[in-house]
Amino acid sequence: MLIDGKPTAKRVSAPLGCDESAYFIKRERLDSLKKKWRVQRGRAKRNGTYDWSLEELLNTREARRRGAPVPDLVGYGYSRSKLGLVQDFFLITRLLTGHVDGFKKVRNAPDSLERVIRASFELLHTLHSLGITHMDLWAANVMLPEQGSAQAIDMENCFFTPTDYLAETLGFQFGFFYFREIYRYVTEAAYDAQVAQALVRYFPDVDRDSFARVYEIAKHEEIGRMKRREIFQNGAIASRWD
């Protein structure tokens, strides 16, 4: 069992194994004393971020409060070690029955690529319109129904405040979407054309030079969580080749 059993990995996620339920559960094993103490006390790290468990809980709750297209938050829980500290953290959301993630859809049906890209860009815009910046929005974090609008998952790396560097932030988001596996299924030129159309439609006033500076790097280089934070907060990015 995902809840009762000993996890085989640090993070495990799966539909809850119950015929009567339609829930999805994530379990994280807290692997250090500092992390257990922070989560138990609800404290942030020195850099201002929370551990994954709390980040996703807080962000999912706030996204739902704003009416964002994300799964319903059902609840959360934890187990304790013999010392009384939090050992495992559980997050339970509504299972998106009838949905498939965008990466799986493209992998199984490459001719669906254009639809996946369009739906993902529309979702990105919807989140921005609600003041939500999802900094890990790749195809597998876009859940697509047979009919209707997409939903976003994995909300742990999000911002809910305005940025002074919207162009740079968008440059990362669009570039990252290409870098994280989509490049395998579309030429860079074709993807660039779809991004250009999306900018005209959704973000016509964005500064194109500032956008392009980050976009060209994000398409080809891995950018970690803290560097993404720098982009959002300061518009700062440097290529590894600089």
Question: Predicted segment positions?
Answer:
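Hydrophobic "anchor" residues on beta-strands that sit immediately upstream
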Residues: 90, 132, 150
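Conserved ATP-binding subdomain of kinase catalytic cores across diverse folds
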Residues: 2-98, 129
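Short acidic, glycine/proline-rich loop/turn micro-motifs
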Residues: 35-41, 103-107, 162-165
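Conserved protein kinase catalytic/activation segment
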Residues: 141-152
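Short, glycine/acidic-enriched loop or turn micro-motifs at the edges of active sites
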Residues: 97, 139, 157
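Soluble, non-transmembrane catalytic domains of enzymes that act on hydrophobic metabolites at membranes
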Residues: 1, 55, 128, 145-146, ...
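Conserved kinase catalytic-core helix
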Residues: 59-70, 103-135, 139-140
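C-lobe/activation-segment region of protein kinase-like
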Residues: 151-242
